[in-house]
């Protein structure tokens, strides 16, 4: 697809960005397939651990509080580092989606180096749990995970259908 876009767009230059996925995520806390459960039992990638350590003072409270409540461990499985809870499953799911979409984005940029973005369906209410909204997408709660996992995504964007425009945009600035 990107090869075709490049071929068609090279003379006009009208394409300004590529969106590898739209409102990514699943409506549950995680994928319970055998492959996913096996991956969930593996170590949290050091890329994420190092990102959290380096950016600890600026991490979103949702990630920071879960990490600190579980001892701010710097190695271990998703359950070991983040606890046996919905948040460890959400963080794991987010990592999987973000690294996959980053892979797609990096490949697209090798063919046609345009900016890429990923948008998300926003959390509607503060007490909504992952899966009420598409879990794994770049909602503000897990934006730090997206930043660590998806360096080839240039913009994380909210898909805004709520009235609190100013605060939502501030979350993504």
Residue spans of the language-model regions?
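Catalytic-core region of carbohydrate-active enzymes that cleave or remodel glycosidic bonds
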Residues: 103-114, 141-173
């Amino acid at each position: 697809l990107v090869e075709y876009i490049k071929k068609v767009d090279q003379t006009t230059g009208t394409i300004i960005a590529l969106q590898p996925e739209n409102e990514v995520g699943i409506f549950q806390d995680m994928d319970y397939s055998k492959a996913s459960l096996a991956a969930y039992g593996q170590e949290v990638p050091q890329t994420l651990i190092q990102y959290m350590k380096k950016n600890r003072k600026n991490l979103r409270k949702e990630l920071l509080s879960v990490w600190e409540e579980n001892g701010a461990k710097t190695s271990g499985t998703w359950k070991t580092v983040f606890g046996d809870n919905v948040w460890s499953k959400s963080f794991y799911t987010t990592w999987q989606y973000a690294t996959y979409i980053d892979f797609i984005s990096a490949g697209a940029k090798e063919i046609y180096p345009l900016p890429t973005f990923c948008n998300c369906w926003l959390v509607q209410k503060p007490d909504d749990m992952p899966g009420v909204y598409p879990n794994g997408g770049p909602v503000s709660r897990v934006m730090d995970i997206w930043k660590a996992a998806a360096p080839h995504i240039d913009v994380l964007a909210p898909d805004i259908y709520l009235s609190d425009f100013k605060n939502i945009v501030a979350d993504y600035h």
